[in-house]
Amino acid sequence: MAKVTANDLLERFQLELLSGEEGIHRSITTSDISRPGIEMAGFFTYYPAKRLQLLGRTELSFYKQLSPVDKEERMSKLCTYDTPGIIISRGLEVPPELLKASEKVGVPVLRSNITTTRLSSMLTNFLESQLAPTTAVHGVLVDIYGIGVLITGSSGVGKSETALDLVRRGHRLVADDSVEIRREHEDTLVGRSPELIQHLLEIRGLGIINVMTLFGAGAVRPFKRIALCVNLELWDQKKVYDRLGLSEDYLRIMNVDIPKLTIPVRPGRNLAVIIEVAAMNFRLKRLGINAAQQFSDRLNDVIEEGEQEF
């Protein structure tokens, strides 16, 4: 899980730092945003201090009606040593009591000109993306006809060579060798390349090549949602492979199941074309067109008709 601080928000959303510079590098550990409306009324029993606090027009309008003593009390309770930051939206004027309390405990106070609702949505999306669970998988990720295909298999089976052929056919490389995967939602996995090897492809006997330099910017993309896994394995004569496409297998990554196809590798098989067709067939299945199921249904109908004749 990546580390996110108020300083990252400062740079990302071009915020204005007003006070509490001492705590600008405090870690933000949750993507939940708190709008402390009930806290402005004095109820701090269940105050989520570890969340980012967002103050808008509603909270500050109520705050202005408080007595000077209550104002100081509310802001001193709002600013704790666990609070990662407080953001003021709409470019509103910041209460001096907040500036004083934030400096005392080192809580960064930031200000933005963006409306409260929109800012809350932007912050939540950014934090969910950055704080999402992360893992790394050995394989190649390619965007094929808009489908994120994760190509896996043992070392030397031909993953990178297949990816190179796919790039030559007009598809886009996301990552080679190591794929960093984030679970950004309950059922969404997004893969990207580590920065060190971004746009690079390693071909045995040839070495490392830069795909973007060779094929242009259209041959790469920074990230892609993973929708399908294609596992390459050396052909095993003793193993029975699926010939109809009715059986479904899945690869589980961080409790998310990804449809998985196993493609046996042997001389003479054009893996790039096979994976290309697999991606197109996957799209058809999502549209409700399943050729294997249609064939099975027709076959069953023929068998039933034959039984009725006898």
From Swiss-Prot:
Tell me the active site.
138, 159, 177, 243
- Remaining remarks: Both phosphorylation and phosphorolysis are carried out by the same active site and suggest a common mechanism for both reactions.
- What is the name of the protein in this document? HPr kinase/phosphorylase
**EC number of the protein:** 2.7.11.-, 2.7.4.-
Q: Which Pfam families match?
A: Hpr_kinase_C, Hpr_kinase_N
Q: What class of enzyme is it?
A: transferase
Which residue stretches belong to region Important for the catalytic mechanism of dephosphorylation?
A: 264-269
- Chain's gene name: hprK
Q: How does it assemble?
A: Homohexamer.
Annotated region Important for the catalytic mechanism of both phosphorylation and dephosphorylation: the residues are: 201-210
Q: What is the superkingdom listed in this entry's lineage?
A: Bacteria
| Family stated for the protein in its record | Belongs to the HPrK/P family.
Free-text note regarding domains: The Walker A ATP-binding motif also binds Pi and PPi.
Where is Mg(2+) annotated to bind? 160, 202
Organism of provenance: Halalkalibacterium halodurans (strain ATCC BAA-125 / DSM 18197 / FERM 7344 / JCM 9153 / C-125)
In alphabetical order, the GO MF annotations are: ATP binding; magnesium ion binding; phosphorelay sensor kinase activity; protein serine/threonine kinase activity; protein serine/threonine/tyrosine kinase activity
The Swiss-Prot or TrEMBL record lists the needed cofactor(s) as: Mg(2+)
HAMAP family in the record: HPr_kinase
- The positions annotated for binding ATP are 153-160
Q: Which reaction does it catalyse?
A: [HPr protein]-L-serine + ATP = [HPr protein]-O-phospho-L-serine + ADP + H(+); [HPr protein]-O-phospho-L-serine + phosphate + H(+) = [HPr protein]-L-serine + diphosphate
Q: Name one GO biological process term.
A: regulation of carbohydrate metabolic process
This protein's UniProt keywords: ATP-binding, Carbohydrate metabolism, Kinase, Magnesium, Metal-binding, Multifunctional enzyme, Nucleotide-binding, Serine/threonine-protein kinase, Transferase
User: What does it do?
Assistant: Catalyzes the ATP- as well as the pyrophosphate-dependent phosphorylation of a specific serine residue in HPr, a phosphocarrier protein of the phosphoenolpyruvate-dependent sugar phosphotransferase system (PTS). HprK/P also catalyzes the pyrophosphate-producing, inorganic phosphate-dependent dephosphorylation (phosphorolysis) of seryl-phosphorylated HPr (P-Ser-HPr).
